[in-house]
């Protein structure tokens, strides 16, 4: 392959990373620096220039979408399909490994993946069965505890309670949960990684096989790896494996779910002779945006250090707007987007970012009032929707009768007269006899241990599942799926729901059938039946959003959801102390720097225009709370920002009670355009009025002090 084909169009540092000798390497890649391109060209370099076998390459990404895109781009660059490479997420690759060695991993061949919702259901049932107070020992907290311990590589036997009764109870729940999973052949996401790691620990011959095979390992988004993922990669590499990691310590924003930004430094310490190449040239943002991002993140300690730059223009200054409250903030953002549209801009080039989902409501209302289409990015995902979960549960039960989570979900869906009392008997008997729920149901029916009506209903359910399994086993996957949805009664149940919601559910069921029709085997699924392969695919995809057809609509999302995206115009709202950085980060040591990294991620999403807004007052928990501007606003260099001021003519005032309705005077005794004097801020002009009586508020543009909102009853303003 011609070397120039792989290096043309790359900058000097990108070329250096692509053509680096085969050794351990950290590519410290700043936002918008073309890291994906570097990874793709590096793999193509290994194949086309170094003549490495595709079978020697493992590439780890953090989403299935990124893995599919990487494989596609490599094949486009090389010009041929490259089978044999392992490209996927940590969970996907661990799943592939466990499927190939299920006996050595002490798993049944048809083991099923338990997603977070099913994990929660199982834990709720176990906590109830253990006679624990579900409020004191919530299933969500138990899930967090168990997953956290697994991410650290810890089984119950490895955890010391030190006589702490709280820790002892969590350990009991962990133990009971794991025993239930083992009985039913269920593996949760954290278990995939832990068991894959244990497989290599306990079976050195298997580890050695993969060490000899995968001599070229590449890992993307390394700042987001947790302890077990780091240990997994380190064990696979051994002493002779060559590992390239790509990451950015300044974009590590998932510490709350176990990510260890320190893993980048651990890599430099643990992997012999590891070198560092910095990608600092940015191809996304203007110079002003990059200067602001650099200044912001420079306030964090312990960084590996890099300075983003561009050979593009300075662009517009970053706009900062001080709103009176969240209503004013939303109005301002919507009006700015209107101006963008009037100047020929597309709505889908505009993104509104916020720290938490709760902030979206007021923004949505403002957009609705102006009939401006919008989309909540990262909303309910396809495989997490109720009707899809129900359908998959039937399919899972057909594939594996011992799947307790699937049994629990559909045994009375649609309603068929199997009540909680009957299910409690089944659960209790299952615990006593150490059986799965399906096995227990069959035993109780054989022993005639259930009341007549309940027994009949349970009998009909087991016969339904058995008949569906038998009659559809030879059908194409999409025909099988359609048959199960119809014969189980799910289609009719949701069809009877009527209205837009019912129609949406039916459309989703149709889309599930389409998904099974379009599903194609991956090479790692060659030993699985079609249904088992698709169920594994669905479980692995459940954590990733299914994008709707892209429309011209404003994009609303949290800053976490925005990572990896870019927009021409970005608004970051709620830039207030206690909102962003969050109150929790201010109260807990070590969290503030991750909040600043999150702000850095938000700022670097903007390509052309960035606007930051904060409100002086915001209604929280039913009360109006006063906030100071976020420290992150104060950390931006003055030469890169501009404060947005209302026009001096005050020709278009706004009443925040009825957005868009002009108000020129209220019962406060003040009027728009009036000159006033304040003891602290000096002279200014009233540019806005809001409220009435004791709640009357004034927005005043002070000379040299900016725009301030004041409560008329307390401001002690003098007319000039």
Language-model features: where?
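Structural signature of nuclease core domains in nucleic-acid processing machines
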Residues: 1, 240, 562-579, 584-587, ...
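Conserved helicase NTPase motor core
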Residues: 3, 8-19, 23-28, 38-39, ...
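Conserved glycine(s) of the Walker
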Residues: 34-35
């Amino acid at each position: 392959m011609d070397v120039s084909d792989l290096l043309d169009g790359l900058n000097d540092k990108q070329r250096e990373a692509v053509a680096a000798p085969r050794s351990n390497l950290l590519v410290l890649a700043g936002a918008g620096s073309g890291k994906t391109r570097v990874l793709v060209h590096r793999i193509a370099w290994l194949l086309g220039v170094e003549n490495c076998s595709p079978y020697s390459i493992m590439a780890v990404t953090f989403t299935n979408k990124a893995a599919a895109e990487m494989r596609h781009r490599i094949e486009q660059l090389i010009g041929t399909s490259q089978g044999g490479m392992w490209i996927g997420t940590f969970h996907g690759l661990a799943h592939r490994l466990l499927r190939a060695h299920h006996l050595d991993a002490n798993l049944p061949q048809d083991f099923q993946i338990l997603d977070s919702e099913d994990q929660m259901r199982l834990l709720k049932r176990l906590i109830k069965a253990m006679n624990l107070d579900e409020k004191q020992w919530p299933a969500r907290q138990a899930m967090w505890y168990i997953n956290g311990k697994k991410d650290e590589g810890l089984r119950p036997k490895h955890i010391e309670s030190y006589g702490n009764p709280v820790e002892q109870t969590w350990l009991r729940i962990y133990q009971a949960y794991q025993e239930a999973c083992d009985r039913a052949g269920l593996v949760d996401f954290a278990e995939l990684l832990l068991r894959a790691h244990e497989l290599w620990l306990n079976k050195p011959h298997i580890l050695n096989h993969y060490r000899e095979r995968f001599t070229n390992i590449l890992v993307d988004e390394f700042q987001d790896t947790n302890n077990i993922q780091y240990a997994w990669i380190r064990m696979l590499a051994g002493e002779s494996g060559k590992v390239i990691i790509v990451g950015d310590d300044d974009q590590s924003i998932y510490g709350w779910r176990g990510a260890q930004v320190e893993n980048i430094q651990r890599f430099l310490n643990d992997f012999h002779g590891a070198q560092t190449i910095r990608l600092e040239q940015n191809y996304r943002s203007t110079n002003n945006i990059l200067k602001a991002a650099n200044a912001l993140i420079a306030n964090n300690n312990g960084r590996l250090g890099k300075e983003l730059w561009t050979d593009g223009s300075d662009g517009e200054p970053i706009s900062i707007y001080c709103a009176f409250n969240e209503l004013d903030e939303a109005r301002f953002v919507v009006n700015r987007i209107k101006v963008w549209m009037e100047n020929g801009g597309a709505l889908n080039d505009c993104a509104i970012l916020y720290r938490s989902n709760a902030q979206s409501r007021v923004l949505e209302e403002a957009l609705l009032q102006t009939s401006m289409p919008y989309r909540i990015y990262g909303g309910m995902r396809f495989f997490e929707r109720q009707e899809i979960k129900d359908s998959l549960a039937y399919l899972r039960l057909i594939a594996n009768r011992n799947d307790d989570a699937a049994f629990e979900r559909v045994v009375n869906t649609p309603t068929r007269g199997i009540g909680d009392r009957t299910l409690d008997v089944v659960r209790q008997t299952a615990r006593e006899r150490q059986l799965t729920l399906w096995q227990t149901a069959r035993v109780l029916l054989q022993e005639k241990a259930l009341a007549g009506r309940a027994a009949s209903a349970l009998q009909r359910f087991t016969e339904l599942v058995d008949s569906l399994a038998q009659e559809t086993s030879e059908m194409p996957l999409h025909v099988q799926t359609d048959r199960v949805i119809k014969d189980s009664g799910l289609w009719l149940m949701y069809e009877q729901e009527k209205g837009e919601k019912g129609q949406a559910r039916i459309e989703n069921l149709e889309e599930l059938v389409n998904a099974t029709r379009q599903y194609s085997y991956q090479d790692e699924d060659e030993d699985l039946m079609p249904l088992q392969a698709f169920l594994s695919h669905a479980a692995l995809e459940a954590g990733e959003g299914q994008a709707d057809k892209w429309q011209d609509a404003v994009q609303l999302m949290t800053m976490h959801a925005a990572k990896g995206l870019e927009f021409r115009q970005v608004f970051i709202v709620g830039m207030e102390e206690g909102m962003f950085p969050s109150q929790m980060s201010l109260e807990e040591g070590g969290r503030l720097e991750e909040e600043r990294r999150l702000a850095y991620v938000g700022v670097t999403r903007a390509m052309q225009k960035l606007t930051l807004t904060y409100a002086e007052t915001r209604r929280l928990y039913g009360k109006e709370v006063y906030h100071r501007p976020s420290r992150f606003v104060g950390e931006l260099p003055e030469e890169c920002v501009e404060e947005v001021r209302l026009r001096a003519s005050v020709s278009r005032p706004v009443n925040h009670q009825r957005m868009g309705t002009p108000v020129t005077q209220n019962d406060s005794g003040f009027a728009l355009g009036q000159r006033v004097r304040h003891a602290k801020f000096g002279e200014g002009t009233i540019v806005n009025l809001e409220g009435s009586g004791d709640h009357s508020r004034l927005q005043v543009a002070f000379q040299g002090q900016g725009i301030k909102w004041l409560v008329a009853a307390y401001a002690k303003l003098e007319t000039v």
